[in-house]
Amino acid sequence: MFSLQELCRKNIYILPYPLGKHVLQQLGLYWKGHGSLQRIGDDHVLLQQDLIFSINEALRMAGEEGNNEVVKLLLLWEGNLHYAIIGALEGDRYDLIHKYYDQIGDCHKILPLIQDPQIFEKCHELSNSCNIRCLLEHAVKHDMLSILQKHREQIRLHLALTQILFELACHERKNDIIRWIGYSLHIHHLETIFDVAFAHKNLSLYVLGYELLMHKVNTEAAYIELPNLLSYHLRTAAAGGLLNFMLETIKHGGYVDKTVLSAAIRYKHRKIVAHFIHQVPRKTVKKLLLYAVQARAPKKTLNLLLSSLNYSVHTITKQLVHNVVIYSSTLVVKLLLMRRKNKLNLVDAVLARLVKYSTYTDIVQFMSEFSVSPERVIKMAARESRTFLIEMISKAAWGNHPQTLIHHLKQLAHTMKSQSGKDLIIYTIHYIYLNSNMLVAEEEKNIFKLAKFYANHNAVNRFKQVCEDYYALDVDARFKTLILECFEIAVQKNYPRIANIVDDYVRFLFYRGDITEEEIHEAYSLKDAEFYVDLKWLQHDLF
């Protein structure tokens, strides 16, 4: 509990009128040797109605004098005890420190407030559990170079401690201490200074790192793979977009090559690429373009690389197409198409590779991007024997109606040059036919057309099956017409197996009385028909 006097002392800011020394002493508002003490605002005091100090500065002064009464008053006024301890250390008032020792807590928290190296060490000594390493580490953190210099010999004898202090100085970015350690002591590993410089994009620290590295190379016998280190730094700087770091590295022998610029491309630092692109061989630029496609670089980067090649990429077309497909990176295809001069159309080449190796989803996406017709893709899929693609793209383009699908696929078969591709489309048509409900009277005309289509393309087995299905519809007159028309097709196109199937059906129809001898003679009177059928059976049956 506070006494009434303490409550008054704590909360009175302005005295009502000047009081005498005796009254002030009784109130505890008199500082011996200085005069009256009065609080102003939240964090200042007025001394002898004349001098203004911060409460913490007044605490330091009171601590230096060992004036505990004033210290207690200033603490009531919300001063920081740490300043009283600093003052006590400056005045060697250890009796005062002893009184407040339990309230101090961690002495290391006082260190940032101290500017004097001697007081810094004395404060650190207040912590009984700390050693010389702890002191030196805090000296690094708080820029107390003179303390490190004082203990130089102790540091020099412990290589591990030297490395620890150096790395700590790097992380704290204390350049003066880093430089002193680098020149005065032996450092085994310098990597930390570069790592920190990259992490914080601190060019001055990076420059200092090379200063120490060159000093180490020139003064120590240690072997350093400088070319590899320089290359690593260039790649790291390029990946971070740090052009100034790269220029600094080049000063010391660094060389910008494909791996360096690839890092810049990967992390989308076009300005880095633009700065060095004209310093590398054309062959390297082509490799960078291929990598840019792989990395899905933005438009400006691709245009930069293409323009440096004058958009002449014919020698790497195959690799470009490969990367476009493998990495789903089609932007370069669009850019090459947009050229008014030297336009290069890679759409067909990319599409062909997509159809051969990629998924349905990738192909559909490409079709959408480049307005590719489904017919074009289906033909490619047929040539590559990708039945699944034919079915999926057909349904996506024309719906799931069997007649519509068959109609479009028949058109494709008519224009398909590859026989294996044509056979696959016909196979797909027949698959759709078998899995549909076409074997009804309403579909008679469509089945009629399908049978003629099979005859036209010499699809023997499929023709035979559709003829059987068509006959089952019980449309005798139309069936006879179909058979006779297909015989004409077989003769004209030299399809002996189709002709043999037709001949069998003609005999069957004749025996049933559905076709006359005159109709048979008329149908078989076609030029070269005798090479496909033998009419002796007809003469034999008549006699």
From Swiss-Prot:
Family per record: Belongs to the asfivirus MGF 505 family.
Annotated TM spans: none
Source superkingdom: Viruses
InterPro entries recorded: MGF_505 (IPR004858)
Pfam families xrefs: DUF249
Protein function: Plays a role in virus cell tropism, and may be required for efficient virus replication in macrophages.
Protein name per its UniProtKB record: Protein MGF 505-10R
Keywords: Early protein
Induction: Expressed in the early phase of the viral replicative cycle.
Lineage: Viruses, Varidnaviria, Bamfordvirae, Nucleocytoviricota, Pokkesviricetes
Transferase recorded as keyword: no
